Amino acid sequence: LSAAAFFNFGTFHFGAYTHVWDTYHYVIGAKYFPELGYTGLYEATIAAEREAGLLPPGAVVPVRDLVTNALGTANADELLARWKPRLGERWSDFVTDVLWFRTRTMPDHFRRTLLDHGYNATPAWAILGSALARVSGPVTDRSVSLLLLLDPLLLLGGWLLLRRAFGWRA
């Protein structure tokens, strides 16, 4: 029963195993944690959208300020000027990775993603997830699928360890 619940009883979000909203936070947030920390994900994402031409010059978009947790707006041009230098050599990779997520959902849905509460993973995931996301290379269907296998594999490993320690009746 717990295994079925983990997989939402076979009813996936928007018909796919990949829940784009959550995966965006935990993959991009971990992969670029050294540059973004816990508070830069949404601002840098808006900057990437502006760089890619998905937002017009002077665009002001709704976003949650991850420092104050307040909803507000941000100027995409100002964010581009701030975040492009901060990511330095990794900027073009960041833009490419953000665009993968941006193209996997409707623009309005992705816009609402930036009103959520940001990347809030544990420090353990910030370390492990960052390493795994970097090793997996650019965000692609394959790399995301492999990263998403981590949870079920860890659960399976836990069950196998329980069985070994206490027998199948436990």
Indicate where each model-derived feature is located:
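Multi-pass membrane glycosyltransferase architecture that uses lipid-linked
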Residues: L1-A170
